[in-house]
């Protein structure tokens, strides 16, 4: 099973529209669920996983208000398409292992994804690109309610929805706000703005990578037990909004300071993308972030509507590169191939950038 080309085009275009908030461009929501009639995933045999897969996917047909869903059993899906979906939805899952009994179910709108038999029997995932977080969460809850009526999720009056990881019990909701805050991180103001007592944690964009590649900080709720969806969203919104305002103020201060060290960092980043023949993902994200800061501070000239940070944030990921820059019958995700391809793409896109006189 493969994704149809028109759906792939839809997923790419969903990310090309200008974002309402450049500092806070993306928010995701995940609801973890398990069937009441089955044991948790680590206790299941391959045959039991296949039964659960068939049972859950049979209820993704003709859900009112959601359009068509496409089911992709992982064992039959090309690696680049599996990675493409995880990249698009910013899902931090590792695809290593036996995919038997696992599947992804994607909506044609490009807003919703279901992961079956990954960590729980079912994880419902939604992504918002335009700042309509309440609408996205409401739709995800509607989808959850419909499936609950058909599948009967495991629920305890004391602990709420039951999940493989006890930390996810309760509402089973994990919300993530992705913030691009290079000015706050450069000026080292970020740590002073996070209240450690608040039930919010920070993490990296890239799975298993420390620090904040691309100067992107991911805010998420620490747990969901004893908290409503509305309370979780409100807490994250307050923190994300505070950081967004602080980032704008930090950029203004950096512009007034006119630091030679910052100019050097920005121009070295431009040189890296202009003259490299191989580029790794982390260093590319970092360089793009500093260049975008340079554009915002007026240190780099840019052609009109130059698509630097968005949608390049996605386009430099390896499955997106494979889709858009390789022939359909020969898509290759090997490290050297992707590193060369990434450098070639960035070299072309940075032709329209030049430093202001210093």
Swiss-Prot record:
A Pfam family that the UniProt record links to this protein: ATP-gua_Ptrans
Reaction(s) this enzyme catalyzes, per UniProt: L-arginyl-[protein] + ATP = N(omega)-phospho-L-arginyl-[protein] + ADP + H(+)
Every Phosphagen kinase C-terminal domain range: 23-250
EC number: 2.7.14.1
GO cellular component: extracellular space
Transmembrane segments: none
Residue numbers binding ATP: 26-30, 174-178, 203-208
Keywords annotated in UniProt: ATP-binding, Kinase, Nucleotide-binding, Transferase
Biological processes per GO annotation: phosphocreatine biosynthetic process
InterPro entries: Arg_Kinase, ATP-guanido_PTrfase, ATP-guanido_PTrfase_cat, Gln_synth/guanido_kin_cat_dom
Database matches in NCBIfam families: PRK01059.1-1
Family: Belongs to the ATP:guanido phosphotransferase family.
Physiological role: Catalyzes the specific phosphorylation of arginine residues in proteins.
Name of this protein: Protein-arginine kinase
Organism of this sequence: Chlamydia pneumoniae
């Amino acid at each position: 099973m493969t994704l149809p080309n028109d759906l792939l085009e839809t997923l790419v275009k969903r990310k090309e529209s200008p974002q309402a908030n450049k500092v806070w461009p993306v928010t995701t929501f995940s609801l973890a669920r398990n069937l009441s009639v089955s044991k948790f995933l680590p206790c299941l045999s391959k045959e039991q996983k296949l039964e659960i897969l068939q049972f859950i996917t049979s209820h993704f047909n003709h859900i009112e208000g959601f359009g068509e869903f496409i089911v992709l059993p992982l064992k039959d899906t090309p690696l680049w398409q599996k990675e493409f979906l995880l990249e698009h939805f910013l899902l931090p899952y590792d695809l290593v292992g036996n995919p038997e009994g696992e599947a992804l179910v994607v909506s044609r709108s490009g807003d919703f994804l279901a992961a079956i038999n990954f960590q729980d029997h079912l994880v419902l995932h939604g992504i918002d690109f335009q700042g309509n977080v309440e609408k996205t969460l409401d739709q995800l809850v509607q989808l959850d309610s419909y499936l609950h009526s058909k599948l009967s999720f495991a629920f305890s009056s004391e602990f709420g929805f039951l999940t493989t990881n006890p930390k996810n019990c309760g509402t089973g909701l994990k919300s993530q706000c992705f913030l691009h805050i290079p000015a706050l991180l450069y000026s080292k103001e970020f740590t002073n703005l996070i209240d450690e007592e608040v039930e919010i944690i920070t993490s990296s964009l890239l799975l298993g990578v420390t620090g904040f590649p691309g100067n992107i900080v991911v805010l998420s709720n620490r747990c969901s037990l004893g908290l409503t969806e509305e309370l979780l969203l409100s807490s994250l919104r307050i923190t994300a909004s505070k950081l967004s305002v602080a980032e704008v103020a930090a950029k203004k201060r950096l512009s007034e300071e006119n630091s030679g060290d910052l100019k050097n960092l920005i121009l070295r980043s431009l040189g890296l993308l202009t003259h490299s023949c191989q580029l790794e993902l982390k260093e590319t994200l970092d360089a793009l972030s500093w260049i975008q800061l340079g554009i915002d501070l007026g240190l780099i000239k840019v052609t009109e509507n130059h698509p630097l940070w968005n949608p390049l944030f996605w386009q430099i990921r390896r499955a997106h590169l494979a889709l858009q820059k390789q022939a359909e019958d020969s898509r290759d995700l090997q490290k050297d191939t992707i590193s060369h391809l990434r450098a070639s793409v960035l070299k072309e896109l940075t032709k329209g950038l030049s430093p202001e006189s210093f």
